């Protein structure tokens, strides 16, 4: 490739539902979102851009549903879920106690913002 590099990456997504799953919109196999930059990594070095989680919660989660993030880090999916008009519940799992504290603080901020509006 004459000194050029090619990188191909993907992330797995499991969609679980009770009964028949009926999406509100088609989920494409590629989601185009901005890449993470330094502004997206304010809370955690592996923090992801918020655009993809917001999109996924919007099209996949029913009103009052449940969003589970088994490797939640600083809770980007949790912030997206709690900020959504769908009002889903959120369960996040994280092993690192320091990162759990960061996630809890971010989720509390979203809760405070929602309560103020």
Regions found by a protein language model. Give the residues of each.
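Conserved SAM-binding loop
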Residues: 103-104
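Core catalytic lobe of class I
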Residues: 1-93
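S-adenosyl-L-methionine
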Residues: 107-117
């Amino acid at each position: 490739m004459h000194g050029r590099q090619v990188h191909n990456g993907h992330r797995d997504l499991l969609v679980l539902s009770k009964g028949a799953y009926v999406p509100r919109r088609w989920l494409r196999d590629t989601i185009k979102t901005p890449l993470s930059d330094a502004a997206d990594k304010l809370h955690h070095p592996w923090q992801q851009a918020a655009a993809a989680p917001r999109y996924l919660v919007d099209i996949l989660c029913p009103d009052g549903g449940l969003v589970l993030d088994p490797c939640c880090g600083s809770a980007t999916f949790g912030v997206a879920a709690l900020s959504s008009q769908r009002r889903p519940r959120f369960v996040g799992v994280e092993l690192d106690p320091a990162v759990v504290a960061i996630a809890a603080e971010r989720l509390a901020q979203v809760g405070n913002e929602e309560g103020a509006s």
